[in-house]
UniProtKB/Swiss-Prot annotation:
Topology within the bilayer: Multi-pass membrane protein
Signal peptide start and end residues: 1-27
Protein name (database record): Cobalt transport protein CbiM
Entry keyword set: Cell membrane, Cobalamin biosynthesis, Cobalt, Cobalt transport, Ion transport, Membrane, Signal, Transmembrane, Transmembrane helix, Transport
Database matches in InterPro entries: CbiM (IPR018024), CbiM/NikMN (IPR002751)
Gene: cbiM
Subunit structure: Forms an energy-coupling factor (ECF) transporter complex composed of an ATP-binding protein (A component, CbiO), a transmembrane protein (T component, CbiQ) and 2 possible substrate-capture proteins (S components, CbiM and CbiN) of unknown stoichimetry.
Function (record text): Part of the energy-coupling factor (ECF) transporter complex CbiMNOQ involved in cobalt import.
Location within or outside the cell: Cell membrane
Parts of the chain that traverse the membrane: 35-55, 66-86, 103-123, 131-151, 166-186, 208-228
Cystine crosslinks: none
Recorded family membership: Belongs to the CbiM family.
Molecular function via GO: cobalt ion transmembrane transporter activity
Organism, scientific name: Acetohalobium arabaticum (strain ATCC 49924 / DSM 5501 / Z-7288)
Length: 251
C-alpha cells in the first residue's frame, strides 16, 4: 500500500469519528451485574471457544499479512468502536446503537471480529462504564459472535447468488445489526422469563428497541456500503488479496 492509500485510510478514521461520534457516549450493552450469576457464567463459557479461535486468526493475519491488510484490520476495529459507541434514543426511553461488525466480517470473516469486538467491549466496560465485565460474555456473544457470523453468512450467500456487491454488503451489515439485538433480547428473556414465560418476555424485550433498531440497521447498512466503496476505490488490491472481490467487480 502506497503513502496515498495510507493517508486515505487514516483519514477514514477521523471522517467516521467526526460524522458519527457524539458528545456523550452510551452503548446498549447488558449492564454490569444485571444478569444473574448463572447466566453470566453460561455466556462466558459459550464465548471463550470463539475467542480462542479468533485470537489464532488475528495472530495469523498480523504475522503473515502485509501492512495494507493490517491497516484494514485496524480500520475494522475502529469502525466497531465508533459505531457501537454511538447512542440513539429510543421512543421507549432506552437507547440503541449500531454495531459496526459487518464491515470487518465482510473483509476478514467472522473470527477476527470476535477478538476486535471483545477488545472494544472491554474498553467500553472498563473506561466508559458501558456494559460490564460480568456481562462481557453475553455482550461478546451477541455483538461479536452472532453479529459477525450472520453478516458474513448473508454476504457470502448473496455473493453466491450473484447479487450486486452493494446489496450483499448492505444486507450483511444490516442483518448483523438486527440479529445482535435479537440475541440480546433472547439473552434477557432467558434470564428474566417472568410470570408469563419466555415468549412473552422475549416480545417485551424486543419491543424495547424495535422502534429504532430497524431504521438503525438500514442506516448502518448504508454507512457500511459507503465505507466499502471508499475501500474499493483506494484499496482495491487489498480487497482482492483478501478475496473480498475479484477482478472487475464494483459496488
Amino acid at each position: 500500500m502506497n503513502k496515498k492509500k495510507n493517508t486515505i485510510l487514516i483519514g477514514l478514521y477521523f471522517l467516521v469519528g467526526i460524522m458519527l461520534f457524539p458528545d456523550r457516549i452510551y452503548a446498549m450493552h447488558i449492564a454490569e451485574g444485571f444478569l444473574p450469576v448463572k447466566w453470566a457464567g453460561i455466556w462466558w463459557i459459550a464465548m471463550l471457544p470463539f475467542l480462542a479461535l479468533g485470537i489464532k486468526k488475528v495472530k495469523s493475519i498480523t504475522q503473515k499479512e502485509g501492512p495494507g491488510i493490517k491497516m484494514l484490520l485496524a480500520l475494522a476495529g475502529a469502525f466497531v468502536f465508533v459505531l457501537s459507541s454511538l447512542k440513539l434514543p429510543s421512543l421507549t426511553g432506552s437507547c440503541s446503537h449500531p454495531t459496526g461488525v459487518g464491515l470487518g466480517a465482510i473483509l476478514f470473516g467472522p473470527w477476527p471480529m470476535v477478538v476486535l469486538g471483545c477488545i472494544v467491549l472491554i474498553f467500553q466496560a472498563v473506561l466508559l462504564a458501558h456494559g460490564g465485565l460480568t456481562t462481557l460474555g453475553a455482550n461478546v456473544f451477541s455483538m461479536a459472535i452472532v453479529g459477525p457470523f450472520v453478516a458474513y453468512g448473508a454476504y457470502r450467500l448473496l455473493k453466491k447468488l450473484n447479487a450486486p456487491n452493494w446489496l450483499s454488503v448492505f444486507t450483511g451489515s444490516a442483518l448483523g445489526n438486527l440479529l445482535t439485538y435479537i440475541t440480546t433480547a433472547t439473552q434477557l428473556a432467558w434470564a428474566f422469563p417472568g410470570k408469563t414465560g419466555f415468549i412473552a418476555s422475549l416480545i417485551k424485550f424486543m419491543g424495547v428497541f424495535a422502534t429504532t433498531q430497524v431504521p438503525l440497521a438500514v442506516t448502518e447498512g448504508l454507512v457500511t456500503v459507503l465505507i466499502f466503496n471508499l475501500l474499493l476505490e483506494y484499496s482495491e488490491g487489498e480487497l482482492k488479496e483478501l478475496s473480498v472481490i475479484s477482478k472487475g467487480e464494483t459496488v
